[in-house]
Amino acid sequence: MNIKQLRLVIRLAEEQRDAATAQLASGKAQWQVAQDQLEQLQRYQGQYVVQAKQEAQRGISVQALFEGRRFIAELDDLIMKQQQNVEQQALALQSLTEQWMDAARYVQALEQLETLQV
């Protein structure tokens, strides 16, 4: 392969690596949003439980107690779904990281080859 062809291949590989970098950044942002939402749900649930306990100590109706428990169960379901979402985002992020690493190694190998040919 002549040097012009090699430089073209390097340029294309760099573009591929740059695209992988952008995808990785997007994947990290998506994971962070999912993680933040999970933490927000967990905080809200904790605050709601504390508030519900305080209200229960002051005395509330059976209906209000039932609705409070139902709401906490709904929050549990939301938290479980969000945990699954975070796990899926983490797996996607791992895949994007591997793709970026592969692209970066390929560029590095091509650049080493170019150095040997110059």
Residue ranges, per PLM feature:
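Charge-rich amphipathic alpha-helical interaction elements
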Residues: 1-118
